[in-house]
Swiss-Prot record:
The keyword Cytoplasm does not apply. One of its GO terms (biological process) is proteolysis involved in protein catabolic process. It comes from Rattus norvegicus (Rat). This is Testin-2. Pfam families: Inhibitor_I29 (PF08246), Peptidase_C1 (PF00112).
């Protein structure tokens, strides 16, 4: 059913009389298909090829403009090459902000000094990059990432936690599983449930199933959670003093879909209407510290092929770019 829906959307965005394939791109197209194991029927291939060519040429144009100094980041073809932007956003994001329950508020005024650079990966707080697959479950990966970091702070043991446990067991009244969710509700579930399973004991499947949680496989707990005021200054202090922080961003753009490297800045990015959850694991700047070269170090959940081995540098101190500070939270363990 989902595949049929996506194909219908694709047909709306790419006319059924798709243009004749560009023969000069035959080699690139076939290499890309082989690399990602893509197979299509005859009608579908024509549509998918048209989408892929459109994306390929968009990436090439952007990178020429990058060489001319018009952008600070590159784009790169990846596994999402045959997805329209509408398909991509529906399939690969998953943040749905809901009513915020009463919670603690981060007291950023308590911290007067923060370092100029932070990277929690170097201190052992961050698990390897994961892949949510074709499931809009970014909220679950963002939540487990922050919880993994806080459990490491407490126990000095870095244990990957189970996103599938969240997908299967939270209930449809608080999450929509592969159709989106909310990190704070994930923390509330772990608190109420008394634990969260390890990834090893409850591996990721990328679709909702019957809950199979067993308390003996739990490796984390939550006592409460904290909301961070919606400013980059408060977020910076939280990242510096607490550890990896769950945040949401606007990932609606082709430039985000095919981000390659460098400091990401998208003029059309919104500070509200956020749709994708990620994990801020640090911040810093490129070259000499100056205006315009600061970034947030963001861990995504689209595998290591995307971006900088699964990470992004997102523009920092640019009026809350892409809404990175609009909604941010972390658990108390």
């Amino acid at each position: 059913m989902i595949a049929v829906l996506f194909l219908a959307i694709l047909c709306l965005e790419v006319d059924s009389t798709a243009p004749t394939p560009d023969p000069s791109l035959d080699v690139e197209w076939n290499e890309w298909r082989t690399k990602h194991g893509k197979t299509y029927n005859m009608n579908e291939e024509r549509l998918k090829r048209a989408v892929w060519e459109k994306n390929f040429k968009m990436i090439e144009l952007h990178n020429w403009e990058y060489l001319e100094g018009r952008h600070d980041f590159t784009m790169a073809m990846n596994a999402f090459g045959d997805l329209t932007n509408i398909e991509f956003v529906k399939m690969m994001t998953g943040f749905q902000r809901q009513k915020i329950k009463k919670t603690h508020i981060f007291q950023d005024h308590q911290f007067l000094y923060v370092p100029k650079r932070v990277d929690w990966r170097q201190l052992g707080y961050v698990t390897p990059v994961k892949n949510q697959g074709h499931c809009a479950s970014s909220w679950a990966f963002s939540a487990t990432g922050s919880l993994e970091g806080q459990m490491f702070r407490k126990t000095e043991r870095l244990i990957p936690l189970s996103e599938q446990n969240l997908l299967d067991c939270m209930g449809s009244n608080v999450t929509h599983g592969c159709s989106g969710g909310f990190m704070q509700y994930a923390f509330q579930y772990v608190k109420d449930n008394g634990g969260l399973a390890t990834e090893e004991s409850y591996p990721y499947r990328g679709q909702g199933r019957e809950c199979r949680y067993h308390a003996e496989n739990s490796a984390a707990n939550v006592r409460d959670f904290v909301q961070i005021p919606g400013s980059e200054e408060a977020l910076m202090k939280a990242v510096a003093k607490v550890g990896p922080i769950s945040v949401a961003v606007d990932a609606s753009h082709g430039s985000f879909q095919f981000y390659g490297s460098g400091i990401y800045y998208e003029p059309q990015c919104k500070r509200v209407h956020l749709n994708h959850a990620v994990l801020v694991v640090g911040y810093g700047f490129e070259g000499e510290e100056s205006d315009g070269n600061s970034f947030w170090l963001v861990k995504n959940s689209w595998g290591e092929e995307w971006g900088m081995k699964g990470y992004m540098k997102l523009a920092k101190d640019w009026s809350n770019h892409c809404g990175i500070a609009t909604y941010s939270t972390y658990p108390i363990v």
